[in-house]
């Protein structure tokens, strides 16, 4: 009986990638905040993730299933979250202000406030720095493709 209760407690405390994740600009993405520990991240998003083998630092890919592309990437530095960004264009992801992935670029500039464009290879990132944090809006062919959160002035371009 104790073993069964312990198992229920473990399962209940295990998080998972949100089905319709939210960006709170300057604060969190998918329920994860910059500076959280690796353990806090796994508690929030669960233990199902892949590791990037070609990345400079430790990067985890939380996806909706094995061999699926959409989800959330978490970059860690010294065991803490240093950057977050969506993978591909996960359906249903949105901002606290109602901006949804798939929106046209004009909606981003209207709803996100003042942003600065950064040219990357094949796409543009509209960034806004505030309170030591950079919120990134990834735009491909005039359409909002993804969200990101990192330290202010960090390079938002991802490969």
Q: Predicted segment positions?
A:
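Extracellular beta-rich ligand/substrate-recognition surface
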Residues: 88-90
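Eukaryote-biased recognition of intrinsically disordered, low-complexity regulatory segments
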Residues: 82-86
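Long, compositionally biased, intrinsically disordered segments
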Residues: 18-19, 25-28, 36
């Amino acid at each position: 009986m104790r073993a069964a209760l312990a198992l229920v407690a473990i399962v209940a405390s295990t998080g998972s990638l949100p089905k319709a994740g939210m960006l709170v600009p300057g604060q969190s993405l998918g329920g994860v905040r910059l500076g959280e520990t690796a353990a806090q991240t796994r508690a929030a998003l669960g233990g199902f993730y892949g590791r990037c083998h070609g990345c400079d630092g430790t990067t985890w890919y939380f996806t909706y299933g094995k061999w699926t592309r959409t989800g959330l990437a978490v970059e860690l530095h010294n065991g803490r979250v240093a950057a977050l960004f969506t993978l591909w264009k996960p359906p249903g992801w949105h901002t606290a202000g109602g901006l949804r992935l798939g929106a046209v670029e004009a909606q981003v500039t209207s709803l996100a406030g003042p942003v600065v464009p950064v040219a990357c290879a094949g796409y543009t990132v509209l960034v806004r720095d505030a309170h030591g944090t950079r919120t990134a809006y990834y735009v491909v062919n005039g359409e909002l493709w993804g969200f990101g959160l990192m330290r202010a002035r960090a390079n938002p371009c991802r490969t």
